[in-house]
Amino acid sequence: MTKRVTIIDVKDYVGQEVTIGAWVANKSGKGKIAFLQLRDGTAFFQGVAFKPNFVEKFGEEVGLEKFDVIKRLSQETSVYVTGIVKEDERSKFGYELDITDIEVIGESQDYPITPKEHGTDFLMDNRHLWLRSRKQVAVLQIRNAIIYATYEFFDKNGFMKFDSPILSGNAAEDSTELFETDYFGTPAYLSQSGQLYLEAGAMALGRVFDFGPVFRAEKSKTRRHLTEFWMMDAEYSYLTHDESLDLQEAYVKALLQGVLDRAPQALETLERDTELLKRYIAEPFKRITYDQAIDLLQEHENDEDADYEHLEHGDDFGSPHETWISNHFGVPTFVMNYPAAIKAFYMKPVPGNPERVLCADLLAPEGYGEIIGGSMREEDYDALVAKMDELGMDRTEYEFYLDLRKYGTVPHGGFGIGIERMVTFAAGTKHIREAIPFPRMLHRIKP
């Protein structure tokens, strides 16, 4: 019995006969030769079958029958294919399989997603099948590399995984984007972020991170928004603002390096410019203040490439502004110290300037916009209560959060990153819907 291996590992078996469990992604050939494009989730590569070889091995009757099976294979038929691994310099993968035997496991008739072009709605309706395509597999491999690198980075930096709840009894700071559900007769809400709970974790464990799904009822149809997505939140006690920015920069660079190391073929499939990714890792990220960014936007608003509306100090950025800023510097760019009026209640003011808060958004270049948001948290009980009263917030909804300031408060801060936005940036894809297996968007909840 031959050894069963995955496609990605065939390089270790050159000259040997192996068996691979795979699906037929495509098929071509004529006469005495057949070419199979095979995939198994780890990689794609080609298998070649020669009719004379089958006749020689199995005899004329059985050999012709087996070769006829290969000729009749349809797209996405599942098979066990056996063959000799050979190096192939013509192939991007570098190897091919000289097929010696095949066994059909599951037939596939009239597969909906043929090699021709299909519309987006059709592909999204068949997302469960579209996932199998070469480019979609590549994007999900990059997603996997980013998730793996996330756990690796925080483990190396002394953070503990801390699981915050998905159901919450209190509305977060933006109640207009909440999904509400009934919790045994009491209103409950799907989590928008685990941050408030992570702050409790940081007071117990020092450094914590959470990774899980969050939900925002955003009635937005842009290429950067989902109603359900995966968020990594980190929280760190005894932290300064500069230390937080350093950590965020190191984290994003670790994610990019993780993709380069663990998913090089996926990047090649997507034709991602890896030299750009390497430059983002090598060069320091740019850091500017919100007010410097506004000044810069005003200075260049009449430039030919300035496709954005005029902003005054105090206004929030839109996507065109974020795109222009990050493209202007050509590297990921931190915009720091936003106006308190457009940021969350828990953010700590800039010392000596209460109109600005110690926060930063990291803007990715190439038009990908914000991928990280972070801030120092207000650790002073009286200052936080005053801010909540100013905004008309109900303190009773945040009793546990205020307790953190009453019992051993410390300087602390953190940040969050939407994994799908990071995947989109790393993969170089145009729309966030491809960065998650089953996207949930406005008007899209199936399959």
Swiss-Prot record:
Keywords: Aminoacyl-tRNA synthetase, ATP-binding, Cytoplasm, Ligase, Nucleotide-binding, Protein biosynthesis
Stored InterPro entries: Aa-tRNA-synt_II, aa-tRNA-synth_II, aa-tRNA-synth_II/BPL/LPL, Asn-tRNA-ligase, Asp/Asn-tRNA-synth_IIb, NA-bd_OB-fold, NA-bd_OB_tRNA
Coiled-coil stretches noted in the UniProt entry, renumbered to this chain: none
A GO CC term assigned to this protein in UniProt: cytoplasm
Family label: Belongs to the class-II aminoacyl-tRNA synthetase family.
MF (Gene Ontology): asparagine-tRNA ligase activity; ATP binding; catalytic activity, acting on a protein; nucleic acid binding; transferase activity
KW Membrane (keyword) present: no
Reaction equation(s) it catalyzes: tRNA(Asn) + L-asparagine + ATP = L-asparaginyl-tRNA(Asn) + AMP + diphosphate + H(+)
EC top class named in words: ligase
Stretch forming the signal peptide: none
Organism: Streptococcus pneumoniae serotype 4 (strain ATCC BAA-334 / TIGR4)
Protein name per Swiss-Prot or TrEMBL: Asparagine--tRNA ligase
Lineage: Bacteria, Bacillati, Bacillota, Bacilli, Lactobacillales
Origin superkingdom: Bacteria
Main location: cytoplasm
Protein's cellular compartments: Cytoplasm
